[in-house]
Each structure stands twice: as C-alpha cells, then as structure tokens.
C-alpha cells in the first residue's frame, strides 16, 4: 500500500456524510472538511449544520464553510492545507480551475449516476422518474465543467419497480464510499486511467422543486407512478381533494378509464383515479394535519371523503 494521503473532503448532505465516514475509517488523513454554510431548517427555522459538518465536528476535524471558493482568501486557505487530494461529494459549490489545481493529485467526485447520463443536481430522482433500468455511482476526476470529467470507475445497481428516490439514494450511499476508496488507491499508485465521457450521451438532471410534484392527472398513469416513487421522500407528489391538500406517497398501476383525476373506485385495496391513459391506484396518502397512512386505514375511517366521481386536482 502507498503512504496515507492528506485529503480535503468537501460535501454537504447525508449522501456525502456516508463517504466521509468511510474516509475516516481509512488510513488517510482528513486534514479539513468543506461544507455549505449552516441553513435554517425545521419549523423554528433554526440554523442547522449539515450532516457532513456534524460528522466532522464529532471527529475534531477543522470545518470550513466559505460562501464561495472563487475568493482569493478561500483559495489561499485551501492551498495552505497542502492536500494531496480533494474528494468532493454533493458539495453544492462550483470549484473554479484554480481550486481544482491545488491538490497534488487533483480533485475527484463521487456522482450518483452512471455518467454521462444524469449530470447535475438530482440524478437519483431523475433516474427513477425516467424509468431507467439501472443507476450507480461514478467516480470521476473533476474538471471546471459540470460533471464532465474523465470517469475513473463505476459501481452499478439495478433499479427495481419498487424503488423510490429514497431507497435508491440509500443504496447508492452504500455503493459510493468503497468506490471512492478504490479510486484513491488507484490514483495514489498511478494505476488508474480516466475514460473520457461521451458528451453526446449526456443529459441533465434538473434540481427538484415542489411545483413539479403537483400531479397532472392528464398525464399517463405509468409516468405518474414513476413520479410518485421518484419524489418520495421529497418533495412528495400532491394534488387536492375537495380543495384540501392531498399528498400521495405510494401508488401503482390499475385498470380503468375516465376523465383525468376522477375517482373510479375506493376500497381497502386503494383509491383508483383516472389518468390521461389508464388509471393509478393510490395506496398511501396524507391528509392535512394528519400523518401518512395506508389507504386501507383511511378507507376504514374516512371513506365518505372518497366518493366515486369526485375529481382530484380541482
């Protein structure tokens, strides 16, 4: 084995924290952690540290939270750490070329897709939404472009018909860390050669927003079924029922035809709603002020709300 490396880690959400855990358990020295500034969160809107910051503080690792890495002071601070390598995972800040050039071995990134497919901010959810057969993690050498660098290695997992954005996220968070450790070993030995991405195969995974999660019942049922899975646990697909908000946490395909959004049937098996093509069976819902419930429980206690012929989304 080569000598342990001086590594700077940059990341923010839980997905990144799983990678940091693996690095902390490795022989390498984590000399500093970069993460996004604390953000307001929760009902009280208190400033909350990122999962990566919380983990770093538990291990007494210096934490840097510059609002940008374009400032000369921030770049000088990074250079003073004399890193051999920078590992970047869902950090959320652009790294200019001057920063990419600071570490002796450069910067690598663990990205939650099989590049060049799904460059960008929401690759996990977009893969589920599109009905992709597989996903994975790509470890790449970073360039100034967005997720465009040479690919060092990939770890692949199939996407099942039951996968949600959440379940795929958790599986990729397990695949990514060992892939990064393998890539670091290869870079340190000089045995790992990057493969250029084919830009003609690239597409962009746009950031999620709540407006996208509003169900358009004129869309085909299979498209909406994938959307429900992709947007769980956030932002959660939603509609309205008698002018009240209705969150849809789980659904599957059903037979049926009718005006889009119309309740075709309601039973303990689910609420069947007509779509632009075919129908969707809603199996887990959340009403205002309530917690998420299987439709069986809602049907037993609130069946009068789900009258046949009622139209959702009006």
Curated annotation (Swiss-Prot):
EC numbers for this chain: 2.1.2.9
Catalysis: reaction(s): L-methionyl-tRNA(fMet) + (6R)-10-formyltetrahydrofolate = N-formyl-L-methionyl-tRNA(fMet) + (6S)-5,6,7,8-tetrahydrofolate + H(+)
GO cellular component: cytosol
EC primary class: transferase
InterPro entries for this protein: Fmt (IPR005794), Formyl_trans_C (IPR005793), Formyl_trans_C_sf (IPR037022), Formyl_transf_N (IPR002376), Formyl_transf_N_sf (IPR036477), Formyl_transferase-like_C_sf (IPR011034), GART_AS (IPR001555), Met-tRNA-FMT_C (IPR044135)
GO molecular function list: methionyl-tRNA formyltransferase activity
Domain of life: Bacteria
Entry keywords, A to Z: Protein biosynthesis, Transferase
Residues that hold (6S)-5,6,7,8-tetrahydrofolate according to the record: 113-116
PANTHER family cross-referenced by the UniProt entry: METHIONYL-TRNA FORMYLTRANSFERASE, METHIONYL-TRNA FORMYLTRANSFERASE, MITOCHONDRIAL
Homology family: Belongs to the Fmt family.
Described purpose of this protein according to its UniProt entry: Attaches a formyl group to the free amino group of methionyl-tRNA(fMet). The formyl group appears to play a dual role in the initiator identity of N-formylmethionyl-tRNA by promoting its recognition by IF2 and preventing the misappropriation of this tRNA by the elongation apparatus.
Name the record gives this protein: Methionyl-tRNA formyltransferase
Gene from which the chain derives: fmt
């Amino acid at each position: 084995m080569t000598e342990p490396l001086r590594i700077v880690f940059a990341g923010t959400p839980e997905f990144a924290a799983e990678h940091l855990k693996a690095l902390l358990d490795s022989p390498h020295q984590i000399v500093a952690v970069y993460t996004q500034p604390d953000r307001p969160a929760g009902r009280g809107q208190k400033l909350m540290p990122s999962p990566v910051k919380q983990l770093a503080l538990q291990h007494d690792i210096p934490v840097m939270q510059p609002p940008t890495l374009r400032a000369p002071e921030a770049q000088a601070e990074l250079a003073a750490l004399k890193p051999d390598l920078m590992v970047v995972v869902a950090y959320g800040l652009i790294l200019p070329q001057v920063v990419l050039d600071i570490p002796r071995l450069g910067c690598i990134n663990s990205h939650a897709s099989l590049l060049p497919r799904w460059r960008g901010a929401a690759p996990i959810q977009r893969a589920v939404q599109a009905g992709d057969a597989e996903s994975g993690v790509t470890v790449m050498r970073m360039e100034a472009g967005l997720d465009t660098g040479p690919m060092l290695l990939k770890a692949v997992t199939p996407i099942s018909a039951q996968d949600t954005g959440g379940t795929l996220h958790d599986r990729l968070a397990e695949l990514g860390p060992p892939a990064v450790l393998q890539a670091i070993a290869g870079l340190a030995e000089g045995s790992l050669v990057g493969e250029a991405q084919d830009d003609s195969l690239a597409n962009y995974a746009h950031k999620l927003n709540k407006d996208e999660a509003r169900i358009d019942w004129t869309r085909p049922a299979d498209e909406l079924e994938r959307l429900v899975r992709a947007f769980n646990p956030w932002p959660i697909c939603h509609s309205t029922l008698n002018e009240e908000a209705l969150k849809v946490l789980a659904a599957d395909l059903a037979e049926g035809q009718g005006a889009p959004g119309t309740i075709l049937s309601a039973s303990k098996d689910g609420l069947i709603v007509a779509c632009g093509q075919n129908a969707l069976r809603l199996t887990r819902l959340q009403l205002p002020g309530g917690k998420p419930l299987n439709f069986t429980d809602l049907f037993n206690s609130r069946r009068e709300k789900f009258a046949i012929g009622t139209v959702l989304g009006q």
